[in-house]
């Protein structure tokens, strides 16, 4: 680990394909936007020798932020893979966006990784969304470590931030969150700020000074020993308390000096088991320096303490018919099981799929089975196809290095899988398998869009289909009631990136229009109507008269048609014609142009002509009768109501309840959950929650999540209904 007093192992440059799973580490970087994840990846790449000079986010020169959108916004918006090699180990660094709108990219990174580095700014602290991701990792036992960045800030407080991390991440055992190093400070400047120039190794009792631009090891001074020993004892006690050797604590308390090698081995095992969470510090390299502060120590932790892919259980696997299939973890000779964790479009090579291989070995030019199931509700139809694998490559940001194979445990990019989408399983053609999907948040911000011009109409459908194939946190809806094309996103930033990609990648200009909800109409009371369609001015005429009664029904009843004609007043062959006309008019609406629902229409009487009556005439009469019945009674305008479930921190429950009240919501109940959070259930009109995905984030400072489901339609308040009717009249 970084505390081992060994010589610098040197850097082997950019990593290529791994030859054995034991020589791979898959690590995802997690943290809020601006915490320094991308800068840290750049510093690690420099220390490992993968780059000769570290780029800056502000200049658009980093390896992992290579998209033009990322350059303009100066933040990550997608998952990026940067493999480096350290001490003979290939380290796949997965840089993820920190902004909540791009949580789908984060979840893909978590799926592909075997361990996580939580990056925390020394000056900004831990936000609510980072805490929630930590809890998700804890639930599945993913090993984690914490890296404190922005040590150069005048507001940086390493000791205070370590305590904050212990409180935020330690749960019932805050002593499991302990630093392996303390910052080493240089001389104070004129402003009184003493810059961090290196680290104090607690286990090794060594100083690691980076002031020269490269790590140099030395002994601590007498004045540094008291603070070091106090922190060292806390660290040793923390390691021993998590040791699998139950005699170690007794020996330590009995005065035995536990040797350095035993402590390091126990530390590494505890980290790999996901029960001990070391805190490290890191800072980017200064101009001209070869190594950033703490980067050597961090690479040693990753290669020595983080688990190999052998220790990562394979997610559940079934046959495509749903029969469970036992797959040995990371068996390079086993059946092929791989998963597409990211899909991107390259202007030169077409679709590129980033794949994590869980079992077997993937090779170019092989035919594989591509299977995607379980996302039909998001516009991803179930699909099973055979496809030929194109070239395999190891990515380094936007660059690609061709490789000959990818073994179980490794990550690789596959070219030209035309049907594969994010989340799909790749398996052998003659042994098709399916991995259980990972959990993705529902996109809850609707974006109604239209092609800007005729020339854009054909390209829009193709562009949207590709976007949704790449990003399973987007959902495409063609609403048959409002006749709108709606792209559901996770938030405004997510929507902005989607629009920009439509324009820049697919050459589609779109207009964003107000999103409409699916309103309905119904009768407030019983009413009758007579439809008379008579035209007899010579030649073959039209003759149809019908009388109906309309009465309201309970919600969810739809349109019920009843025939009570006696004596053949309406010939039997024309009764279906009346019903067809009634249903056609109901679909168009009878007041404000919204479909009519939840009524019973009873045909009572009518008249026909032996020559001039026809199917078309009675359809028209049926429609006229329904319109007349509507003119004599109050028509309710119905709005859809959603059942909303909100998980929010206890501190924000009051604000959430007050906001729901302002949205005409009805709180159904609350329920206390774990982690000082409350589950709030409410019913809210859909017209009031169009932007709730954005507003809730603001109300809860990013700590709340919600889901919504259609409950029913119910009458709108009269003043709101009248406003909508006026808008309809003004538009007609």
Predicted stretch roles:
Residues 1-732:
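Structural and coupling elements of P-loop NTPases
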């Amino acid at each position: 680990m970084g505390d081992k007093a060994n010589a610098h192992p040197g850097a082997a440059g950019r990593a290529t394909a791994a030859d054995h799973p034991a020589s791979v580490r898959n690590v995802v970087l997690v943290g809020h936007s601006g915490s320094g994840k991308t800068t840290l990846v750049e510093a690690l790449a420099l220390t490992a020798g993968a780059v000769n000079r570290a780029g800056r986010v502000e200049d658009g020169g980093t390896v992992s932020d290579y998209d033009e959108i990322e350059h303009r916004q100066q933040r990550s918006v997608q998952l990026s893979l940067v493999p480096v090699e350290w001490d003979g180990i290939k380290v796949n660094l997965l840089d993820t966006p920190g902004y909540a709108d791009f949580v789908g990219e984060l979840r893909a990174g978590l799926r592909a990784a075997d361990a996580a580095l939580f990056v925390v700014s020394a000056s900004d602290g831990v936000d609510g969304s980072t805490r929630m991701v930590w809890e998700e990792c804890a639930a599945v036992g993913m090993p984690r470590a914490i890296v404190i960045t922005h040590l150069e800030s005048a507001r940086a407080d390493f000791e205070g931030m370590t305590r904050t991390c212990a409180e935020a991440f330690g749960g019932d055992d805050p002593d499991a969150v302990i630093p392996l190093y303390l910052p080493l400070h240089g001389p104070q400047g004129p402003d009184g700020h003493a810059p961090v120039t290196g680290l104090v190794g607690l286990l090794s009792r060594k100083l690691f000074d980076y002031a020269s631009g490269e790590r140099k090891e030395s002994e601590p001074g007498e004045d540094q020993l008291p603070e070091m020993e106090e922190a060292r004892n806390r660290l040793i006690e923390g390691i021993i308390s998590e040791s699998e050797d139950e005699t170690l604590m007794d020996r330590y308390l009995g005065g035995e000096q536990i040797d350095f090698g035993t402590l390091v081995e126990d530390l590494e095992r505890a980290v790999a088991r996901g029960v001990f969470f070391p805190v490290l510090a890191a800072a980017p390299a200064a101009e001209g320096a070869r190594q950033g502060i703490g980067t050597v120590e961090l690479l040693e932790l990753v290669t020595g303490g983080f688990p190999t892919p052998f220790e990562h259980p394979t997610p559940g696997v079934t046959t495509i018919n749903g029969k469970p299939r036992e797959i040995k973890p990371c068996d390079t000779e086993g059946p092929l099981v791989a998963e597409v964790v990211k899909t991107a479009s390259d202007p030169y090579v077409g679709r590129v799929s980033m794949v994590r291989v869980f079992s077997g070995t993937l090779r170019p030019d092989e035919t594989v089975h591509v299977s995607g199931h379980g996302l039909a509700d998001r516009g991803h139809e179930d699909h099973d196809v055979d496809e030929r694998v194109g070239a395999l490559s190891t990515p380094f940001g936007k660059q690609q290095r061709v490789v000959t194979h990818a073994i179980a445990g490794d990550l690789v990019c596959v070219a030209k899988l035309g049907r594969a989408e994010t989340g799909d399983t790749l398996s052998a053609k003659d042994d098709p398998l399916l991995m259980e999907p990972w959990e993705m948040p529902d996109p809850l911000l609707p974006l109604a869009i239209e092609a800007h011009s005729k020339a854009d109409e054909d390209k829009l459908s193709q562009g949207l289909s590709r976007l949704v194939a790449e990003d399973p946190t987007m959902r495409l809806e063609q609403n048959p009631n409002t006749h709108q094309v709606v792209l559901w996103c996770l938030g405004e930033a997510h929507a902005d990136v989607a629009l920009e990609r439509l324009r820049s990648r697919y050459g589609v200009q779109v207009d964003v229009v107000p999103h409409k909800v699916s309103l309905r109409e119904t009768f407030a009371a019983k009413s009758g109507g007579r439809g008379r369609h008579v035209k007899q001015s010579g030649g073959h005429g039209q003759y149809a008269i019908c009388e109906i009664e309309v009465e309201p029904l309970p919600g969810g009843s739809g349109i019920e048609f009843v025939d009570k004609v006696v004596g053949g007043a309406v010939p039997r062959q024309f009764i279906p014609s009346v019903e067809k006309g009634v249903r056609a008019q109901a679909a168009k609406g009878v007041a404000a142009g919204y479909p009519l629902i939840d009524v019973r229409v009873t045909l009572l009487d009518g008249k026909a002509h032996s020559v001039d009556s026809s199917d078309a005439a009675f359809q028209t009469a049926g429609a006229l009768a329904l319109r007349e019945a509507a003119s004599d009674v109050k028509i309710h305008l119905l709005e859809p109501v959603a059942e909303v479930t909100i998980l929010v921190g206890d501190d924000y429950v009051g604000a959430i309840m007050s906001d729901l009240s302002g949205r005409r919501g009805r709180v159904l109940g609350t329920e206390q959950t774990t982690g000082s959070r409350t589950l709030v259930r409410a019913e809210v009109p859909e017209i009031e929650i169009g932007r709730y995905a954005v507003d809730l984030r603001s109300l809860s400072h990013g700590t709340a999540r919600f889901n919504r489901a259609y409950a029913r339609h119910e009458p709108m308040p009269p003043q709101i209904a009248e406003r909508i009717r006026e808008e309809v009249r003004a538009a007609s």
